Amino acid sequence: MIQGIHYLDSLLDEMAVKWPDNRIVNIVCHGHSVPSGYFATPFVNTFDAYPHLLHKMIKERFPFAVVNVIVTAKGGENSPHGADRFEKDVLTHNPDVLIIDYCLNDRFCGLAASRMAWEQMIKQSLERDIKVILCTPTWEKAYFEQNENWKMLVQHTEQVRELADYYSVGLADSFAAYERHVKDVMDLSKYLSHVNHPSREGHMLVAQEIAKYFIAR
């Protein structure tokens, strides 16, 4: 079962504690160019990308918490490569929460290889009592073409939803958020900064999806 909005309750209780009894909380965003902050490649717009937007949202809700949002994402990377460096680059930060976002690039390594890599990272995290939130993909120009790339993106979206359900972890359904908002405004271009990267508005949709797990105390 996909975890609901109370998934992080015990951590949120700790985040409401004031100095001198509070502690450092680490949230790690692991993935590809989107959490890295790439807009029109090679331009990296760190402060309009969803890890930073999420950080600001969390601090507004938890003003006494010492929270680090750490980005270990790498442009152009897929999940098998992300899994290869997972222990060295991610687990060394001792995350309380891990956010994984690889679907856009995983289309080109295939569903089976992608699933194996996501499962490896999920299992390694759960073994260490790390809370995990999986992200479905943001949309890109393949939406306009409804081509094979789009069909693959839909398949990877479904696979990530299945993984969140199977491992009983959190889900930030960016794909569904895009679907809702594009239908409302009838304009995907508002949420794109490049052919395959979100604009600030697109990143905000992802940040809001993740932030639903960080309910103010």
Regions found by a protein language model. Give the residues of each.
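Serine-esterase "nucleophile elbow" of acetyl-processing enzymes
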Residues: 2-72, 85-94
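Extracytoplasmic/secreted envelope proteins and their assembly/folding machinery
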Residues: 9-12, 51, 55, 83, ...
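Cell-envelope and extracellular/periplasmic
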Residues: 2, 34, 42, 71-77, ...
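Alpha-helical structural signal in soluble globular domains
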Residues: 53-61, 89, 120, 124, ...
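Catalytic His-Asp segment of secreted/periplasmic serine-dependent ester chemistry enzymes
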Residues: 2, 12, 138-217
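Short, solvent-exposed loop/turn segments at secondary-structure boundaries
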Residues: 39-45, 109-113, 145-149
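Solvent-exposed loop/turn segments at secondary-structure junctions
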Residues: 33-36, 75-79, 104-109, 138-142, ...
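Internal alpha/beta domain cores that form substrate/cofactor-binding pockets in large enzymes
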Residues: 26-28, 59, 64-93, 105-135
